[in-house]
Amino acid sequence: MKIKAIFLMNSIFFSIPLFAGSATCPLSNGINVHTTTQTLNICKHGTVIKTFKIALGYKGIGKKKAGDNKTPIGLYGLAHPRTSNQFKVFIPILYPTSKQLASGYTGRDVGIHGPTQLSSWFNWVNNLPSSTHGCIAVGKNNHIEYVANWVKANPGAKVLII
C-alpha cells in the first residue's frame, strides 16, 4: 500500500511539468506552430521563450499539392533565413519531406515570413487569421527578425506545425 501511495505521488508531481511543457512545446527545442490558436512558440528545453501571433494559408491546413494555398502539417527542417523585398525576411521550410514526396506531395516556397512590404497600407493583412498562400506569417518586421536571428543561432533548427 505504501508503494502505491509513493508511486501515485511521484506520478502526480512529476507528470505536471512534463504535461504543461508538452502542450506548448511538443518540440522541446525548436519552433512550434499551433494552427488552432494561430501562434508560433519558440521553445528551449521545453519552455516557451517567445510567442507570436501568426497567419496561415487562407485555405486552411494540410498542404498536399502545389498551389492549394494550405499550410503543411508536420515536422520540417528550416533553411537559412534570407532577405526578402516582399516580406522583409523569408525562412524556408523544407517542405515536402522525402517521405511526403514519395507519397505524391508537391509544392515549394513554403516558409515563415514577415509582413508584406508592398505598402504600409497593406500590413494589416498579415494580422488576418488566414491570409497567406500556405506560409506562416508574423505581423511585424521586428517579429520576423527575432525568429530569423533565433534560427541563425540554432543551426539545424526545426519547426513542428500542428
Regions found by a protein language model. Name each.
Residues 23-60:
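A structural motif detector for short, solvent-exposed N-terminal "entry" segments of globular domains
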Residues 82-162:
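Exported/periplasmic cell-wall-interacting domains
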Residues 51-53, 75, 109:
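Well-ordered beta-strand positions in beta-sheet-rich domains
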Residues 9-17:
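Bacterial N-terminal signal peptides
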Residues 40-42, 49, 61-64, 86-89, ...:
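Short, solvent-exposed loop/turn elements at domain surfaces
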